[in-house]
Amino acid sequence: RGLGDVYKRQSYKKLMKAYYAKQDTEKLTAKQDTVQKSTLMGSSADSLKVAADKLNDSELFDKDDDTIVKAVKSFIESYNDVVSESGESNNKSVLRNAAWLTGMTGKNAKLLSKAGITIAKGNKLELDEDTLKKADKSTLKSIFNGYNSFAGNVSRKASAISNASKGAGSSYTSKGTYYSKTAASIASGKIDKEV
């Protein structure tokens, strides 16, 4: 064995060490991106729930037009954020709930148009303030007030999206490997045997 072989082995070791360090960094970066997206998605879904609950408050529509417009604009902004961010999600539960949300919104398009809300490109909502201001208050209450109202349904779906996104952020370990609480419970024998 010559000096050349020693250099080759050392070079190979350095190369492999650099390769695996890069792989670890990429896994960590991917995990951090997933956690960041999940955190942002959860925050946006929480904001949507708050905005939908505000619209579901029957006293809102007894207030002046500017207050109502502000609440509807806030709702639309939060809704559009959730639609945009859910489109970038890899979480099946987030995607399923977001698809239900946009589908339900589509089914209510005619009713929403009475409040000046239309569905635009990419399933995002747009507002015609003049139509909203001219809308009958009882029509607005029928759209936004009550458990089964549009706002009530959006509020519940926003909660589901938020919960799903929070689950996504915690499903990866610090090393970037998938972690399942159910699998961990089975492995540790902590699942109840009762049905």
Give the predicted meaning of each segment.
Residues 1, 5-195:
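Polar, low-complexity export/assembly segments characteristic of proteins
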